[in-house]
Structures are given as C-alpha cells and as structure tokens.
C-alpha cells in the first residue's frame, strides 16, 4: 500500500468523514488544504437514487454553470454552409467536414469538445472509434448535435459541463477552480443539482439526490449538507 504524503495525512486529519458540512464550511475546508503548486479543480460526486443497470434510469445531460469551470475550452465543429461562419463567429477553434475528419484520423486531437450539425453526422459517424472512447462523440442528449452550432459553441466556451452517471449511479464532474469564491462554487453546485433534479428519470423512486461530496483534484471528499444549498 502506498504511503500517505504529509499533505494527505493533514487533509485526512482535517476532514471528518462522518460529518456533513454546511456548504460554505465545506468550501473553507477544501481551500485550507489546496495545493500551492497549481490551481486545483473543485470536483463533485453526486450519488443518485437510480438503478444504473436499467437504461431508463440512467442520467445524462449538460448544463451551463453560471461562473464557468475556470478552464479554457477548445471547440471543434463539424458543419457546412452558413453554419461555418456562424461557428467561427461564436468562437469555434476548428471548423470543417471531411478535412477536419482527416486531421482527427491522423491523430490531431487539439480540442476538448466536438459539436456537429445534423447534416454533418454522416462524416462524424466514421470517427466513432476515435471520438467515442475519449468521450468526445457528439450527442443530441448533451446538445452537441444541433442545427444551432453557434449557440452550442457559446455554451461550451462559457462553462458548459456534461454529466453522466457511472455504473454505481454516481455523477462525477467539475464545478470550478479552488481560486473561485465560495459563492461562485456554491452557485455552480446549485446549478448542477438543479439540472440533475430536472433530469430525474420517471422510473426512479425514493430520494433522488442521496449524497453530495466536493473535493479538490488532489484532496479528500467532503460531504455536503444538502439543506445548506
């Protein structure tokens, strides 16, 4: 078993794993142990009351965080016609069709999000084995296959996050950076939870959002008292 670093020992000693922290207190605890070497992301894990083995209970979607994620996002767009100029005007970093597909086939993957207009999916569909495993395949459920590519680009650039539960029914995503204010992180978390509540499957019974924990990239999870949200 790997030895705990001094920092991890301090974090574990400073976080009560049996306690649910009020949100502002939870953020204070996170910031107290954040790294001084780089600005860590603030991540969240949300345990949902779903049966992830049932396809009709899986939760997937996207939402724009009011204060963004704190990271720069490069966007590639597959489209043609008038949408080309619209995508570029909205801030897309790469725009194309077959030419863009060829770049990707050569291993040129200098982007974080892929957006496609419906008429471009015949080209994008050929890239499934490349984009799929990386979580980059455009999907209408998260708004990345859309006739309005300009809006999708703006959303991606302004702090849109995508979420999808894992096999244990847990959503893992980012809600900002450790240098965000407590209020910014709280409002981003509230936006995510509101989106998840809206996406609750009709077949899911009982308490839907069962547990919320926040952590920094290299820190321990801090359970949040949902009543403080």
Swiss-Prot record:
Q: Which PROSITE patterns match?
A: RIBOSOMAL_L1 (PS01199)
The record's GO molecular-function terms, alphabetically, read:
rRNA binding; structural constituent of ribosome; tRNA binding
**Pfam families registered for this protein in UniProt:** Ribosomal_L1 (PF00687)
Residues crossing the lipid bilayer are none
* Any single biological process term in GO: translation
Cellular compartments per GO CC: cytosolic large ribosomal subunit
Keywords in alphabetical order: Repressor, Ribonucleoprotein, Ribosomal protein, RNA-binding, rRNA-binding, Translation regulation, tRNA-binding
Please indicate if the UniProt record lists Ribonucleoprotein as a keyword: yes
Q: Which CDD domains is this protein grouped with?
A: Ribosomal_L1
Summary of the function given for this chain in its UniProt record: Binds directly to 23S rRNA. The L1 stalk is quite mobile in the ribosome, and is involved in E site tRNA release. Protein L1 is also a translational repressor protein, it controls the translation of the L11 operon by binding to its mRNA.
The UniProt entry's sequence similarity note says: Belongs to the universal ribosomal protein uL1 family.
Q: Which HAMAP family match?
A: Ribosomal_uL1_B (MF_01318_B)
Quaternary arrangement and interactors, per the entry?
Part of the 50S ribosomal subunit.
Q: Supply the name of the protein.
A: Large ribosomal subunit protein uL1
| Provenance organism | Histophilus somni (strain 129Pt)
């Amino acid at each position: 078993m790997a030895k705990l670093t001094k920092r991890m020992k301090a974090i574990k000693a400073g976080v009560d794993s049996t306690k649910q922290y009020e949100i502002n207190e939870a953020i204070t605890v996170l910031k107290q142990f954040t790294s001084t070497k780089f600005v860590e992301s603030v991540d969240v894990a949300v345990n949902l009351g779903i049966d992830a083995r049932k396809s009709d209970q899986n939760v997937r979607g996207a939402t724009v965080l009011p204060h963004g994620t704190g990271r720069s996002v490069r966007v590639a767009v597959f489209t043609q016609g008038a949408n080309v100029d619209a995508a570029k005007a909205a801030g897309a970093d790469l725009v194309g069709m077959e030419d863009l597909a060829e770049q990707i086939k050569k291993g040129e993957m200098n982007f974080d999000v892929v957006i496609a207009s419906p008429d471009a999916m015949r080209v994008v569909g050929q890239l499934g084995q490349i984009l799929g495993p990386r979580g980059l395949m455009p999907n209408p459920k998260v708004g990345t296959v859309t006739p309005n590519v300009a809006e999708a680009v703006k959303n991606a650039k302004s702090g849109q996050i995508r979420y999808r539960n894992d096999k244990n029914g847990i959503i893992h995503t980012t809600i900002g950076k450790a240098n965000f204010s407590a209020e910014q992180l709280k409002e981003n978390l509230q936006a995510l939870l509101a989106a998840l509540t809206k996406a609750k499957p009709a077949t899911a019974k009982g308490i839907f959002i069962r547990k919320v924990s926040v952590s920094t990239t290299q820190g321990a999870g801090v359970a949040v008292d949902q009543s403080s949200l």
